[in-house]
Amino acid sequence: ARVLESESPILVRESPYPIEETVAKVKTAIGAVNMRLIRVQTLDQGFVADGQENHDQVIVYACDFGFLNEALKVDPRVGLFLPCRVTVVRHAGKVQVMSINPKRLSRIFNNAELNDLCEQMHQVYVQILEESTL
């Protein structure tokens, strides 16, 4: 089997909503795909003093633990990209929602056994990004 080819290392959608509303929509979309919300934090949390965080860069962490176990059985290196993360950024007046492109993982790890799992996760990420920016 050959390793999946993919177009871009990241998936990006532009949101028509303010960043706070977009983050709320990402959280709702995560629940809609049966993932568990782990935490929400600013990108710089822990690197700056409390109260000084940049709220224009927010990471939403989530996981589907059943899927996680399946993926780790195929290739434990997948753990490097866990938990799943969706990043919401406000820059130059625009709000963007982004994540890694899971189709790249089979290529990065040179493991064709990951193809089906990466394709499934790609669909999940696309669904989250699209649902949160509708």
Please state what every model-predicted region is:
Residues 2-39, 134:
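Terminal, regulation- and interaction-focused segments at domain boundaries
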Residues 108-134:
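Well-ordered alpha/beta subsegment
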Residues 32-87:
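Compact, glycine-rich, soluble single-domain proteins
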Residues 27, 44, 126:
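Short glycine-/small-residue-rich flexible loop motifs, especially phosphate/cofactor-binding loops
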